[in-house]
Amino acid sequence: MTNPHDVIIRPVVTEHSMAEMGEKKYTFVVAKDANKTEIKKAVEKVFGVSVDKVNTLNYDGKVKRMGRTQGRTSSFKKAVVKLTADSKEIEFFQGM
C-alpha cells in the first residue's frame, strides 16, 4: 500500500482506548492486509509522530440472524500504536 490514508481507516473511540491514551497508546481500525511495518510508517507520516511499537488484532465478523436468513458482519483488523516517550501526542485525539 502506497497511500498511508489507505492503511488507517478510522480511530477507535472507546472507554478503554481513551484510558490508554495516557500511556501514549492509540487505537485504529486498519486495512486487513496491512502489516505492522506499513501501519507504523502510515501513523508516522499522517500524524508526524514517532512510533515505538505496533500491536495488531484480527476480528472475525459475528454471525447475525434475521428470521431464517443468516449472515455475517464484516471482519476487521485493529492496531494499537504505542508512541515513543519523547514523541508528541496525536492532536486528533486531544478534544475527546
Swiss-Prot record:
Q: Which InterPro entries does this one have?
A: Nucleotide-bd_a/b_plait_sf (IPR012677), Ribosomal_uL23-like (IPR013025), Ribosomal_uL23/eL15/eS24_sf (IPR012678), Ribosomal_uL23_CS (IPR001014)
Q: Which PROSITE patterns match?
A: RIBOSOMAL_L23
- What UniProt keywords apply to this chain's record, in alphabetical order? Ribonucleoprotein, Ribosomal protein, RNA-binding, rRNA-binding
A GO MF annotation of the entry reads: structural constituent of ribosome
- State any GO CC term: ribonucleoprotein complex
Would the keyword Membrane be found if you checked this record's keyword annotation?
A: no
Query: Which one GO biological process term can you cite for this protein?
Result: translation
Keyword Lipid metabolism part of the UniProt annotation: no
Q: State how it assembles.
A: Part of the 50S ribosomal subunit. Contacts protein L29, and trigger factor when it is bound to the ribosome.
Q: PANTHER family this protein is in?
A: 60S RIBOSOMAL PROTEIN L23A
Q: What's the stated role of this polypeptide?
A: One of the early assembly proteins it binds 23S rRNA. One of the proteins that surrounds the polypeptide exit tunnel on the outside of the ribosome. Forms the main docking site for trigger factor binding to the ribosome.
Family statement drawn from the similarity comment of this UniProt entry = Belongs to the universal ribosomal protein uL23 family.
Q: What protein name is recorded for this chain?
A: Large ribosomal subunit protein uL23
> To which species is this protein native?
Clostridioides difficile (strain 630)
Encoding gene, per UniProt annotation = rplW
